């Protein structure tokens, strides 16, 4: 089984690579080769029985996608994207990377020929939905995004559905919850503060909160996100029928509830490292995001996530902090 990971240098790409190398198989088949691709250098890969190669390049550049699929990988994880805040700030870059790059990949797959139809797992987003919202958004709710990022993801969902319908590939679009708590340095995603206000205080640093504590959002841990990707790849798009986009399980909670969970686990002094500093641009973007979902379709297929935000924090402590946190005197 040959695997291609596009966007392999990102947080999910790294964790997915680690998971695949550690397990050595997917869908009951041994993994013989993993090709990692990104516009930046990927970190050194973990030890693996599979042959691991790494390439740098831009999927939106002519010929790059054709080069990647020439080896006919069996499963393709397409994780690469310009994130929400950056896609809103740089209109041309967002469409070039998020839409043109994806279209290039789909066309490259289509032109391989010889009955080649790989399984494609695409990371979409709950940003494909726009207000006004019902109390809980199901998969049947209209995709009407209110940001450039959400629009780009929604267009790609339609393309993947059509290319799957035509038999060029076996694709599925995963409407991922906001992944929290993201390790490492903050990125340019407008949603980054959801992770920052947990990760930084746990590491002994102050964090900025740019929105009100009443803001509600939909979360899942990086561990759950990797499990979503692997389960989708093993399941295949046929399980989704004609509707190839699916909203994945998560946890709906307010920023205030996040901070209550942080204090319960790490103490009041750690909670007090979060400082309110309103940012009108971020507040405007977040105000158009959905808050709660009915993921019963995904759950019926076996997808699972955390049951509480305390669980999400504990996953971060276990996976990123060696099971312990830095505290200060109360």
PLM feature segments, named:
Residues 48-61:
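Rossmann-fold cofactor-recognition segment
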Residues 59-97:
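NAD(P)H-binding glycine-rich loop region in Rossmannoid oxidoreductase-like domains
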Residues 103-147:
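Conserved Rossmann-fold NAD(P)-dependent oxidoreductase catalytic core, especially the SDR/UDP-sugar
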Residues 131, 146-172:
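Active-site Tyr-X1-5-Lys
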Residues 161-217, 222-226:
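NAD(P)-dependent short-chain dehydrogenase/reductase
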Residues 201, 228-286, 326-327:
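Mid/C-terminal beta-alpha module of Rossmann-like enzyme folds, strongest
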Residues 276-278, 290-300, 307-330:
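Amphipathic terminal alpha-helices
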């Amino acid at each position: 089984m040959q695997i291609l990971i596009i966007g392999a240098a990102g947080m999910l790409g790294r964790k997915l690579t680690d998971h695949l190398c550690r397990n050595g198989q997917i869908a009951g088949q041994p993994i013989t080769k993993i090709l990692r691709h990104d516009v930046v250098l990927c970190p050194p890969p973990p030890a693996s029985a599979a042959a691991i190669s790494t390439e740098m390049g831009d999927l939106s550049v002519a010929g790059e996608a054709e080069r990647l699929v020439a080896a006919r990988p069996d499963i393709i994880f397409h994780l690469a994207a310009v994130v929400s805040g950056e896609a809103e700030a740089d209109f041309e870059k967002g469409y070039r990377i998020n839409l043109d790059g994806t279209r290039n990949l789909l066309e490259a797959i289509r032109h391989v020929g010889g009955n080649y139809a790989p399984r494609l797992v695409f990371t979409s987003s709950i940003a494909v939905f726009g207000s006004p919202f019902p109390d809980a958004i199901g998969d049947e709710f209209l995709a009407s995004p209110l940001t450039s990022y959400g629009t780009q993801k929604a267009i790609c969902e339609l393309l993947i559905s059509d290319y799957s319908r035509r038999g060029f590939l076996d694709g599925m679009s995963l409407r991922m919850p906001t992944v929290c708590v993201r390790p490492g340095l903050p990125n340019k995603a407008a949603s980054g503060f959801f992770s920052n206000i947990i990760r930084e205080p746990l590491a002994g640093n102050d964090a900025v909160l740019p929105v009100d504590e009443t803001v509600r959002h939909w979360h899942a841990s990086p561990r759950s996100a990797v499990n979503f990707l692997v389960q989708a790849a093993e399941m295949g798009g046929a399980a989704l029928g004609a509707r190839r986009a699916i909203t994945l399980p998560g946890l709906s909670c307010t920023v205030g509830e996040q901070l209550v969970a942080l204090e319960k686990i790490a103490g009041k002094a750690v909670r007090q490292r979060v400082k309110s500093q309103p940012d009108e641009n971020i507040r405007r973007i977040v105000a158009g995001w959905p808050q709660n979902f009915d993921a019963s379709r995904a759950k019926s297929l076996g997808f699972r996530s955390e049951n509480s935000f305390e669980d999400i924090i504990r996953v971060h402590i276990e996976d990123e902090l060696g099971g312990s946190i830095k505290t200060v005197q109360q």
